[in-house]
Amino acid sequence: MARKLTEKVSWIGKIDWELKRFHGDEYSTHRGSTYNAYLIRDKKTVLVDTVWLPFDHEFVNNLKREIDLKEIDAIVMQHNEVDHSGALPALMQEIPDTPIYCTANGVKILKGHYHQDWNFVPVKTGDTLDLGESKLTFIEAPMLH
C-alpha cells in the first residue's frame, strides 16, 4: 500500500519486520528494515527502485493497485543490489519496454544479476530527466547505501 509523501511522491516500498541482520552479521536490524521505492507522478510517471526479491510479486501487485503499470514512463534504479532491485524482473515481465535509467555501472550490475538486456538508459552526474513540472538530476554516488 502506497503512502503519500507529497502531492507528487508516494512511498511504494516494503517494511520487512522479520529482517534481523543486514549484510550478514555486520548490522543488527532487530526492529526490521524497509526496502524503499517511490512513485513520482508528474506529467511523466517514474518509479524509483523496487524491493527485495522475496517480495517481488507483492510489490508488483501493490503497484498495480496504485497505477496502471503501462502509465509508468520510466524506472530509475539508483541502488542496484538485489535488496532494491529484486522485483525488477517481475515488473519488467509486465512492462518490458519501459526505459530503465541508471549509471553505466548500474547497467553492468543489473545485467549481472538478472541476465537481461532491458531498455537501459545510462546516465551520469548532471544528466536530467524532465518529468513535466519537475525534473530529476542524476548524481553518481558509488557504494552509497
What are these regions (language model features)?
Residues 3-7, 102-145:
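Metallo-beta-lactamase
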Residues 19, 80-85, 107-110, 145:
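Active-site environment of divalent metal-dependent phosphoester hydrolases
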Residues 46-49, 74-77, 137-138:
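Short catalytic-loop micro-motif centered on adjacent basic/acidic residues
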Residues 54-100:
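Active-site metal-binding motif and surrounding structural segment of the metallo-beta-lactamase
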Residues 2-3, 30, 93, 129:
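Generic structural signal for beta-strand residues in well-ordered domains
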